[in-house]
Amino acid sequence: PDPVKRVVRHQRLNSGSASVSVAFKSDKMVNIYWGDGTVDTDVYGDCTGKNAISHTYTDNGIYYIIVAGVIEDITDFETNGIVVWNRL
């Protein structure tokens, strides 16, 4: 398994809160586990600003997003979710 870099909490209440985004920079590949069974694999590069990675949930609920990869190489991390764990 990948080392965990960040755990982010997102709550979908309705269609207005359906999307969450994560932005970061990494020269190494990371995987994003969105908490609903969906995974974006081998994401790397400048994923900030307009290149931020986003995900839209179809069902209401609380989701925990895990950004996993080489811990030391993920920088400039931002999200519109709530960061639960900074590093594990």
Where in the sequence are the language-model features?
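N-terminal capping/linker segments that flank leucine-rich repeat
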Residues: 1-88
